[in-house]
From Swiss-Prot:
Belongs to the universal ribosomal protein uL1 family. It comes from Azorhizobium caulinodans (strain ATCC 43989 / DSM 5975 / JCM 20966 / LMG 6465 / NBRC 14845 / NCIMB 13405 / ORS 571). Part of the 50S ribosomal subunit. PANTHER family: 54S RIBOSOMAL PROTEIN L1, MITOCHONDRIAL, LARGE RIBOSOMAL SUBUNIT PROTEIN UL1M. One of its GO terms (molecular function) is rRNA binding. One of its GO terms (biological process) is translation. HAMAP family: Ribosomal_uL1_B. Binds directly to 23S rRNA. The L1 stalk is quite mobile in the ribosome, and is involved in E site tRNA release. Protein L1 is also a translational repressor protein, it controls the translation of the L11 operon by binding to its mRNA. Keywords: Repressor, Ribonucleoprotein, Ribosomal protein, RNA-binding, rRNA-binding, Translation regulation, tRNA-binding. One of its GO terms (cellular component) is cytosolic large ribosomal subunit. The gene is rplA. Pfam families: Ribosomal_L1. InterPro entries: Ribosom_uL1_bac-type, Ribosomal_uL1, Ribosomal_uL1-like, Ribosomal_uL1/biogenesis, Ribosomal_uL1_3-a/b-sand, Ribosomal_uL1_CS. The lineage of its organism: Bacteria, Pseudomonadati, Pseudomonadota, Alphaproteobacteria, Hyphomicrobiales. This is Large ribosomal subunit protein uL1.
Length: 232
C-alpha cells in the first residue's frame, strides 16, 4: 500500500488540478505517467449539461473510433440461417438462437458486445434483466439490432464504443491504450466527443459539454480545455 501511495503521488506531481490543459498537452502528461506493467486504458470523461432522469435528456449512442480501441472485443450474435453464417464469417465469437439464450440464462456470459437480427429480438427480450444491467442488450439506436450482421460485427471488432450518460450526467469511454501514439489518442478522443455532441438530446439546455477530463487505468485525471476537443 505504501508503494502504491508513493506511485500515486509521483503520478500527480507536475499536474495543476485547476488548469484546463490543451488536449495535446494533457495527453503528453498522461502518457508520461503510465508506468504500470500492463498497457493501461486511456479513458475520457465528459460532464454534460443534462439531467438523465428526464427522458428528453437521455444521451446514448455509439462511436466508431478511427484508430480502434486496442481492446479484444468478444462478440455474440443472435441469428439464424444465412444471417448466422454471415455472423460467423464476419468473425463473431458466439452465434446462436435458443441455444445461446439457454447458455446466457445458465449464467455464462463470455462476450463484450451482443448483436441481434430484428426477428430474434422477442427471444432476446427474455434476457433483459440479465443483459440490460450489463449494458449488453442489443439496441437499434447503437446499431446492434440490425440485418447488417457483417457490418455490425466488423464495427464491434474494429473499435465501436457505445456510450450512455450516467445518473450524474457523465459519460465515460475507453478510447485507446497508453501504447497508442498521442496523435492517434487525440483523434479518438475528438471522434468520441463529436459523437456525444451529435447525440445531444432535444431537452438539453445551456452549455452541453461542460467539462472534459482524460485519465489512464492507474493514472491521475487531467482536466482538458473543451475548446481543444469540441470540433463544432
Amino acid at each position: 500500500m505504501a508503494h502504491q501511495g508513493k506511485r500515486v503521488r509521483a503520478a500527480n506531481e507536475g499536474i495543476d488540478r485547476l488548469k484546463l490543459y490543451p488536449l495535446d498537452e494533457a495527453l503528453a502528461l498522461l502518457k508520461a505517467r503510465t508506468t504500470a506493467k500492463f498497457d493501461e486504458t486511456i479513458e475520457v470523461a465528459i460532464n454534460l449539461g443534462v439531467d438523465p432522469r428526464h427522458a428528453d435528456q437521455m444521451v446514448r449512442g455509439v462511436c466508431n473510433l478511427p484508430n480502434g480501441s486496442g481492446r479484444t472485443v468478444r462478440v455474440a450474435v443472435f441469428a439464424r440461417g444465412a444471417k448466422a453464417d454471415e455472423a460467423k464469417a464476419a468473425g463473431a465469437d458466439i452465434v446462436g438462437a435458443e441455444d445461446l439464450l439457454e447458455t446466457i440464462q445458465g449464467g455464462t456470459i463470455e462476450f463484450d458486445r451482443c448483436i441481434a437480427t430484428p426477428d430474434l429480438m422477442p427471444l432476446v427480450g427474455r434476457l433483459g434483466k440479465v443483459l440490460g444491467p450489463r449494458g449488453l442488450m442489443p439496441n437499434p439506436k447503437v446499431g446492434t439490432v440490425t440485418m447488417d450482421v457483417k457490418g455490425a460485427v466488423a464495427a464491434a471488432k474494429g473499435g465501436a464504443v457505445e456510450f450512455r450518460v450516467e445518473k450524474a450526467g457523465i459519460i465515460h469511454g475507453g478510447i485507446g491504450k497508453a501504447s497508442f501514439p498521442a496523435d492517434k489518442l487525440a483523434e479518438n478522443i475528438r471522434a468520441f466527443v463529436d459523437a456525444v455532441v451529435k447525440a445531444k438530446p432535444t431537452g438539453a439546455k445551456g452549455t452541453y459539454v461542460q467539462r472534459v477530463a482524460v485519465s489512464s487505468t492507474m493514472g491521475p485525471g487531467i482536466k482538458v480545455d473543451t475548446a481543444s476537443v469540441v470540433t463544432a
